[in-house]
A protein has these predicted regions:
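Divalent metal-cofactor coordination and adjacent catalytic microenvironments
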Residues: 1-98
Length: 98
């Protein structure tokens, strides 16, 4: 499991969500999920993409968000049903608390 957000790959996510065989389409989708997760973290916390690596627990958030989107077959994060672990971690590091 990658310790920095920038180190997370589609293979890491595939292993985390226990995909046995990963097609080219799956890899593309997983890369999209990683990008969506990073953007969500940036928007939620107010941190830049470069700053995400300063917080190792953001890597956990990426894994959880990707798994949630994969399981639900969506390409967006559902704010109304946000995982409590994700919400707690992001809340601890938010700089845009308006």
């Amino acid at each position: 499991m990658a310790q920095k957000v920038s180190d997370i790959t589609a293979t890491d996510i595939a292993n985390y969500i226990r995909l046995d065989e990963v097609s080219e389409d799956d890899t593309k989708t997983l890369n999209d999920l990683i990008a969506i997760s990073k953007a969500f973290i940036e928007n939620y916390t107010g941190h830049t993409e470069k700053e995400l690596d300063d917080y190792p627990d953001f890597a956990i958030v990426v894994y959880i968000l990707c798994q949630d989107m994969w399981d639900n077959g969506t390409l967006y994060v559902d704010n109304s049903n946000l995982n409590k672990v994700v919400e707690t971690i992001l809340g601890m590091h938010s700089v845009n608390l308006l």
